[in-house]
Amino acid sequence: MTETGLILMWFPLIILGLFVLKWVLKRVNVWIYVSKLGEKKHYLPPGDLGWPVIGNMWSFLRAFKTSDPESFIQSYITRYGRTGIYKAHMFGYPCVLVTTPETCRRVLTDDDAFHIGWPKSTMKLIGRKSFVGISFEEHKRLRRLTSAPVNGPEALSVYIQFIEETVNTDLEKWSKMGEIEFLSHLRKLTFKVIMYIFLSSESEHVMDSLEREYTNLNYGVRAMGINLPGFAYHRALKARKKLVAAFQSIVTNRRNQRKQNISSNRKDMLDNLIDVKDENGRVLDDEEIIDLLLMYLNAGHESSGHLTMWATILMQEHPMILQKAKEEQERIVKKRAPGQKLTLKETREMVYLSQVIDETLRVITFSLTAFREAKSDVQMDGYIIPKGWKVLTWFRNVHLDPEIYPDPKKFDPSRWEGYTPKAGTFLPFGLGSHLCPGNDLAKLEISIFLHHFLLKYRVERSNPGCPVMFLPHNRPKDNCLARITRTMP
């Protein structure tokens, strides 16, 4: 038989073999996770569990790394219809993706049916004693302790002066530096604020070293948990070790100062964490304090820095919106007594600027998803979410739903005029008992920065068409290279 004849004979068999191999591989996760469910398997949401080990992560990463993040959920809608609930295999676990306001609201607010369910790989980075790793009762207790000093009206009134001074100093400095990475400097600014609130620290050296490690940590939070050199997760674990060591040194020093009755001028959050006792008189140990610090300092600067950048450049790209926001700030200043500083009352008069911030939160959707886990079999929309399965609330799909927000990709702050979103339709800070405890502080920081920026500065991007990266968070690939120019003395 000729060589051509052999090829023609074997070619169909090879193709058939590949199809059989694909069929087998695509059913491995089904055999592992679905077969044992018995009759309940017939009530699972539509979807597929992807490939062995990697599940659906390849299609997820491909969508988010090719600047088309909506294509991931759209592929489910195309194949299975607009059910708003789909089964998948993500971050090493069988899971259910929920993509509508109703399903997201149910998952985030029903604490009897769901509890926090971050992947184990992520828990190793965030800390098992942080808010995402502790019991529901312990979470409520620590949230009560930490929310008021971070987010309460009295605390916000105290922080305004420091935030305003920091913003003015940094903007003036940036305007003399020529081309800068706008995002990188904003993250340092917001990190400076959260360090002051939690640790009373204004040390540039300490802040720079910690902020660099947080950058590495965040790249690993939503990466595949592969602990091998060269992978983002491996670098993130190393960053966590360095952060823990730094915070351990800070906590130890603070405890020693207190033993020696060396007190600072103000009581910060670290003092509160050291002082707190439960009903049995138990205090927090160092691991608990360090994990809480690590979590709060990360959440307290990452979102604020990114969202401030996006609000600034989105307004710069829409001159009419920028002008309207600027005129509002000018009216506020005009009513102010000579020599008076910005007040909390004035920030609450920034109605249009608040709409700009809300629209930025919606369009950008800084938090991709929240992780929950079913405590028992949960019925939802005629389907069953099996006990132990992860549930991912897909915020991006809610915020870009044209039935809720017409022309959803258009940056249009006026859509918020006289509009109160229904529960579950606007989720930038989550919902329910795990609502972000620093949401008001974040909006205050953004408002103060934009107030002074609009009055005295403008930004000119070096690469306006720079591609956007979507993991771990939305950002221009060049970290928004730009020049900050002062427009008035």
UniProtKB/Swiss-Prot annotation:
Residue ranges that the Swiss-Prot or TrEMBL entry lists as coiled coil: none
Residues the entry annotates as binding heme: 436
Alphabetical list of InterPro entries matching this protein: Cyt_P450 (IPR001128), Cyt_P450_B (IPR002397), Cyt_P450_CS (IPR017972), Cyt_P450_sf (IPR036396)
Catalytic activity, reaction form: ent-kaur-16-en-19-oate + 3 reduced [NADPH--hemoprotein reductase] + 3 O2 = gibberellin A12 + 3 oxidized [NADPH--hemoprotein reductase] + 4 H2O + 4 H(+); ent-kaur-16-en-19-oate + reduced [NADPH--hemoprotein reductase] + O2 = ent-7alpha-hydroxykaur-16-en-19-oate + oxidized [NADPH--hemoprotein reductase] + H2O + H(+); ent-7alpha-hydroxykaur-16-en-19-oate + reduced [NADPH--hemoprotein reductase] + O2 = gibberellin A12 aldehyde + oxidized [NADPH--hemoprotein reductase] + 2 H2O + H(+); gibberellin A12 aldehyde + reduced [NADPH--hemoprotein reductase] + O2 = gibberellin A12 + oxidized [NADPH--hemoprotein reductase] + H2O + 2 H(+)
BP GO annotations: gibberellin biosynthetic process
KW Membrane (keyword) present: yes
Cofactor needs: heme
UniProt keyword annotations, A-Z: Endoplasmic reticulum, Heme, Iron, Membrane, Metal-binding, Monooxygenase, Oxidoreductase, Transmembrane, Transmembrane helix
Similarity comment: family membership: Belongs to the cytochrome P450 family.
PROSITE patterns noted in UniProt: CYTOCHROME_P450
Cellular component aspect of the GO annotation: endoplasmic reticulum; endoplasmic reticulum membrane
Annotated source species: Arabidopsis thaliana (Mouse-ear cress)
Name assigned to this protein: Ent-kaurenoic acid oxidase 2
MF terms in GO: ent-kaurenoic acid monooxygenase activity; heme binding; iron ion binding
Primary localisation category: endoplasmic reticulum
Superkingdom of origin organism: Eukaryota
Cellular compartment(s): Endoplasmic reticulum membrane
Function in brief: Catalyzes three successive oxidations of ent-kaurenoic acid giving gibberellin 12 (GA12), a key step in gibberellins (GAs) biosynthesis. GAs, which are involved many processes, including stem elongation, play a central role in plant development.
Pathway annotation from the record: Plant hormone biosynthesis; gibberellin biosynthesis
Entry's EC annotation: 1.14.14.107
Distribution of this protein across tissues and organs: Widely expressed. Highly expressed in influorescence stem, influorescence, and silique tissue. Weakly expressed in cauline and rosette leaves. Expressed at a weaker level in stem and influorescence than AtKAO1/CYP88A3.
Enzyme class: oxidoreductase
Lipid bilayer topology: Single-pass membrane protein
